[in-house]
Amino acid sequence: FSCIAGDCKDSCCLGWEIDIDEDSYEYYQTLPGEVGERLRKGMYETEDGGHGIRTNNCGRCIMLNDKNLCDLYIAAGEASLSEVCTDFPRFGIEYRNVEQKCLSLACEEVCRIFFSKTKPVKFVEQELFGDSDDDQGVTEEEAAFFEEVQRELIAILQDRTKPIGVRVDEYLDRANEYQKKLSQNDVEKHIDWISFNDFSFEHFDIRFGIINEMELLRQVWQDYMASGDYRENDIEQLLVYFTFRYIMNAIYDSNIMVYAYLSVMFTMIVRDMNATRFYKNGGSFTIEDQMEVARIFSKEVEHSEENVEAAKEEIIWG
């Protein structure tokens, strides 16, 4: 991945809250020149006592120029950027001496790379030397267990000898087996057990797919699924993406099934958005449409803690 900067149609410097980490904040206090002065005038204190950079009335970061390039980057280099600007579109989870990282679909260049691939997603392991953080309360056995869960669930999703619906059935069944194993203290951790009784893809579809209750949209969805524009591999890739992103969170709250359901639900929402775009396009849906739909969903839902928590609450309490 490489940022396409000014060529990006939906800049990450537009429409986002831009936080400033403490080290960057202290550095900006001493940054010389017009850029430093403009930056300091645009900084503010957030409600939680941190700091951020203001945006203008159009939602553009005050450091974003008319060529959609960052004046701070131009003046002081990449090292001058705050953590949130340096890290995006990367995100990750850390436990023991492991950090899992992925690229977010909220970035249009990531979407282009992601949906241009037809082969199953592969994950790269790399050993880095240096001091690691503490174990964060996670034992070696727990880490190994949840890594097995993640690997096994992704392997089920990537078995292209079976239709995607069958794979999702098996995926949810296997996640339930792991949840039961966890509740039986095969891994020593206290959990709040959540009971799920119905794991079929069909019933899951009915529960969360409002379109099934709306005659017009149901026909739109069926037309989309029957069209040559529907790509089952895209659905697989999305399921794998959400599983990689969310399942390992269970290492801290033990709710494997919640994150498995969340991964399927988010994929289905994107699929339903695809069908709506198909209808609005007059019966066509391109890879560019898929990229835009996924980007919009990721930006508005994935990157909103409130929206993700609301989805989890819907799953838990239904």
Listing of model-derived features with the role each one plays in the protein:
Residues 1-7, 120-125, 238-243:
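Short, compositionally biased low-complexity segments
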Residues 10-45:
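A structured, charge-rich N-terminal accessory region that forms the first stable segment of a protein
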Residues 1-8, 42-82, 99:
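Immediate flanking context of iron-sulfur cluster ligation sites
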Residues 161-318:
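Hydrophobic, aromatic-lined core segments that form the binding pocket/scaffold
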Residues 68, 75-169:
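Internal, well-ordered alpha/beta segment that forms a basic, Gly-enriched binding/recognition surface
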